[in-house]
Amino acid sequence: MFIDNGLKNVKKGMLQDIAEITMGLSPDGSSYNEKQLGIIFFQGRDEFSDRLPKIRLYTSQPKRMAMRNDILMSVRAPVGDINIAHHDCCIGRGLASIRSKYNHQSFLFYTMLNLKKYLDRFNSEGTVFGAISKDALYTIPIDIPSEGKIKNFEQIASPIDTCILNNYKEICCLESLRDTLLPKLMSGEIDVSKIELE
């Protein structure tokens, strides 16, 4: 579905035909904090990982919001890197949030992954720092398969994406537990010498 394979019942369209897009807007810098005050804030791709961004900053004065499961896309160099918001969050001017108009978020995510090569052109168009405008993002040309094919794809991909998100949450929980317990174990505050292992 995401390669040139002669798929039938595909129509030409634009990203705005299947997605709601919000361009980020940075809140006042004085509202940024690392003390978990306010709303999670993602400034740009610096917080990105393979799929889900790392939480580093919060803001008490959010301006533009992305909802949980929205696609976060870098709109400044390098243009086109994507992650998925795992919480409602504020997005800065280095990002855009992209949400399916028809509840086909997995299809939209893999469509955006497939557009990476197309988006790379915005990193080399004669400017020192690559960027993509709102109009250019809205009008990215895409192939839109039939509703039936999209639903079939969604039935396969969506449970896998949910599993990835759940695994990520479990990893975060275990990392937090490790970071809490390890210093106490190292200092002797918690004594495990008398624990019997079977």
Per-segment meaning from a language model:
Residues Q43-R45, S60-K117, R121-L137:
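A short beta-sheet element
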Residues G29-S31, N123, Y168-K169:
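A short, aromatic/hydrophobic, helix- or strand-capping loop or linear motif
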Residues G13-Y32, L37-R68, I91-G92:
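Sequence-specific dsDNA recognition surfaces
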Residues M1-S26, D143, E147-V192:
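Non-catalytic DNA-recognition/assembly elements of restriction-modification systems
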Residues V75-R76, H86, R99-Y102, I144, ...:
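Active-site proximal loops enriched in glycine and acidic residues that flank catalytic Cys/His/Asp
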Residues Q16, E20, I40, A96, ...:
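Generic alpha-helical structural context detector
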Residues G126-G130, A136-Q155, K194-E198:
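Short, charged, low-complexity amphipathic alpha-helix
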